[in-house]
Amino acid sequence: MSIKSDKWIRRMAQEHGMIEPFVERQVRGEGANRVISFGVSSYGYDVRCADEFKVFTNINSATVDPKNFDEKSFVDIKSDVCIIPPNSFALARTVEYFRIPRNVLTICLGKSTYARCGIIVNVTPLEPEWEGHVTLEFSNTTTLPAKIYANEGVAQMLFLESDEECEVSYKDRGGKYQGQRGVTLPRT
């Protein structure tokens, strides 16, 4: 497996729709308009967070059960920022829609800007031939409220290309998150 460069990412996005919408350079903004960077980097793509969030709340004193998740455990927010309560988490989605090639596995890592503030981004790998908006999980590990900015960079995708195609892709096995749009809750 080899990690793919900015040239490969640009070509795959422009010719094969791997990332839509696609930003072909790294955007940082200037002066008072600085943003947390997004777009193509040397060996990855920095994704943006959309403006729709689901913030975890325990007002119903529920038990968190991944096999029987209660949608009422979240408060829906549509905003340019999301405040995550101390020691809690929120779900969001990427602005970008991904179409992963059959011979590629994509790994997501959080941006250091958030990590240095105690905000951890978690995403499972994007498997071969998976497509959809990526659901992002933000954990606030601090004892203070934490802010997430919509339409700015939140994580970096790294594309690993195999020297051979897999026998069975995510699409082949009818993965339960195939084609997801919006913030997607757990499915079993």
Swiss-Prot record:
Q: In which pathway does it act?
A: Pyrimidine metabolism; dUMP biosynthesis; dUMP from dCTP (dUTP route): step 1/2
Q: Per its record, what are the GO molecular function terms?
A: dCTP deaminase activity; nucleotide binding
Q: What is its EC number?
A: 3.5.4.13
InterPro entries in alphabetical order: dCTP_deaminase, dUTPase-like_sf, dUTPase_trimeric
Keywords for the protein's UniProt record, in alphabetical order: Hydrolase, Nucleotide metabolism, Nucleotide-binding
Q: Does the keyword field hold DNA-binding?
A: no
Catalytic reaction annotation: dCTP + H2O + H(+) = dUTP + NH4(+)
Q: Where does dCTP bind?
A: K111, S112, T113, Y114, A115, R116, T135, L136, E137, Q156, Y170, Q180
Domain of life of the source: Bacteria
Q: What GO terms describe the biological role, i.e. biological process, of this protein?
A: dUMP biosynthetic process; dUTP biosynthetic process; nucleobase-containing small molecule interconversion
Catalytic residue positions: E137 (proton donor/acceptor)
Q: Which PANTHER family match?
A: DCTP DEAMINASE (PTHR42680:SF3)
The protein's job, in short, is: Catalyzes the deamination of dCTP to dUTP.
Family under the similarity heading: Belongs to the dCTP deaminase family.
Q: Partners and quaternary state?
A: Homotrimer.
Protein name as it appears in the record: dCTP deaminase
**What is the organism field in this record?**
Pseudomonas syringae pv. tomato (strain ATCC BAA-871 / DC3000)
Task: Give the lineage.
Answer: Bacteria, Pseudomonadati, Pseudomonadota, Gammaproteobacteria, Pseudomonadales
